[in-house]
Structure formats: C-alpha cells, structure tokens
Design a protein with these regions (language model features):
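N-terminal glycine-rich FAD/FM-binding segment characteristic of electron-transfer flavoproteins
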Residues: 1-256
Length: 256
C-alpha cells in the first residue's frame, strides 16, 4: 500500500500544510511519498525529504507545473496513480482546484476536507459549518482526498527520504497562468497561525478595529482575523476573514 502526498509550496519553501497532510497519510497506512511539482523548487524537494515518515520525494521541475494548475497537475498525477492507493492533497486554494479534476479523470468520488482517517475506506469530515461530523465510507479502489490541515499535527523533520526526478507534463493546456497579486505581510499566515486576534462588527468602525485589534496582535506576534460581518462592513480586508466562508483556523490562542 502506498500514498502520494502533493506538496504545498511557493517554489521557494515548503508550506507547513504539507507536514500535516503527511500525518494524515500516515494514518491511512503504507508508504508515504511526496510529490514536489514546481519550477526551480529544488530547495522545496530537499525540505520535503526531511519530513518524518516519508519514503521518497518525487521532484518534477518544469514551467508547466510552476503554478500547479489543475490541468497540468492532473496530467502529471493521474498516470502516477497506478502505483498508489490514494493521493492526499492539502485543502488549500491550490489543492481544491486540482483535486476535482484528478478525481474526475480517475472516475472516483473525491473525499473533501477530511479531519480524520478511520481506516483505508472510512474518513470523517465536518458538515453544517462544523456543527456535525460526517463519517464517509468509499469503495473506490483509488482515493482522492483533500485534508483539512488544522485537524492534524505536523509531521516532524527527522527524515532522510530519497529524491527522484521525474518529467513534467509537456502541454500545451487550455488554461494558463496569467498573473497573481500576493498580499505581503510580516504577520503569520492566518490559516496556520498559532495565535490569532480577531474582531467583529461590535467594534463599530475600521478605526476601532485598527486601534484595538492590530496593536494587540502586534504584541502577541499573532495573525489578525475578522468575522464575516466585520469584513462586509469594511473594517478588515477579505483575507482576514475567519470561519465557514473564510479561513479555517486552529490556533493555540484565539482572542476575539
């Protein structure tokens, strides 16, 4: 039995979400391999090789997978699945984009946003905005699974996996990367932050939000969060939104 984990990264560093997905994959059982697909992502592959419990890292370098678009990743991953029982993907924007296409090409049901692995066929995932837990059983021979990283501890970094090179899909593909606008911040990334300070509509204005929430977050070296109502009212930008329609968080300290 073997599991393929698709690494979340920016071609420069390995996102901690990958470590958490490795923990979930280990609960599934069997050997765990990591796929690092990107352009100039050698450092990412080296970091992935150090993740505990990983057998090997498959490093695919090429312009076609630089941004891990769904078409290119499907063309890469689907042929690889002959050697794997499941593919585990972080439930991030990138992961949620590629997983449905991979599942469709494999003709299997995607298992989304899981929070626990019961056995090789049975998984848990939240429903009704997290107010209930659904147990899902799949009879598909191949599993395509997105993982809610906040539900799992991060794997350690005492591994020494081998790194193997593989070819990138040639393309061309119908979709292509045009541009991206990244929000730059010195704060921790909200979804993975250990400390979060969050504000809601009761603060009354953007000025009060900035006066009360931001300085406290600075003191605690925390990420800043906001409720949907606060975001809709213009107190905070969309990328601060926490909850069902925003970022899922599981910090050690949450102040609201």
């Amino acid at each position: 039995m073997a599991v393929l984990v698709i690494a979340e990264h920016d071609n420069a560093s390995l996102n901690d979400a990958t470590h958490k997905v490795v923990t979930a994959a280990a609960k599934f059982g069997g050997d765990v391999d990591i796929l690092v697909a990107g352009e100039g992502a050698g450092d990412v592959a080296a970091a992935a090789a150090k993740v505990s419990g990983v057998r090997k890292v498959v490093h695919v370098d090429g312009a076609s997978v630089a941004k891990q678009l769904a078409e290119a990743m499907e063309a890469l991953v689907v042929p690889m699945m002959s050697g794997y029982d499941a593919v585990f993907i972080p439930a991030t924007t990138t992961g949620k984009n590629m997983a449905p296409r991979i599942a469709a090409k494999l003709d299997v049901m995607q298992l989304s946003d899981i929070t626990d692995v019961i056995d090789t066929d049975t998984f848990e995932r939240p429903i009704y905005a997290g107010n209930a837990i659904l147990t899902v059983k799949s009879s598909d021979a191949k599993k395509v699974i997105t993982v809610r990283g906040t539900a799992f501890e991060a794997a350690g970094e005492d591994g020494s996996a081998s790194v193997e090179a593989a070819d990138a899909p040639a393309g061309p593909f119908k979709s292509e990367f045009v541009s991206e606008q990244m929000v730059k911040s010195d704060r921790p990334e909200l979804a993975g932050a250990k400390r979060v300070v969050s504000g809601g509509r009761a603060l009354g204005s953007k000025e009060e939000f900035d006066r009360l929430i931001v300085p406290l977050a600075d003191k605690l070296e925390a990420a800043v969060g906001a409720s949907r109502a606060a975001v809709d009212a213009g107190y905070a930008p969309n990328d601060y939104q926490v909850g069902q329609t925003g970022k899922i968080v599981a910090p050690e300290l949450y102040v609201a």
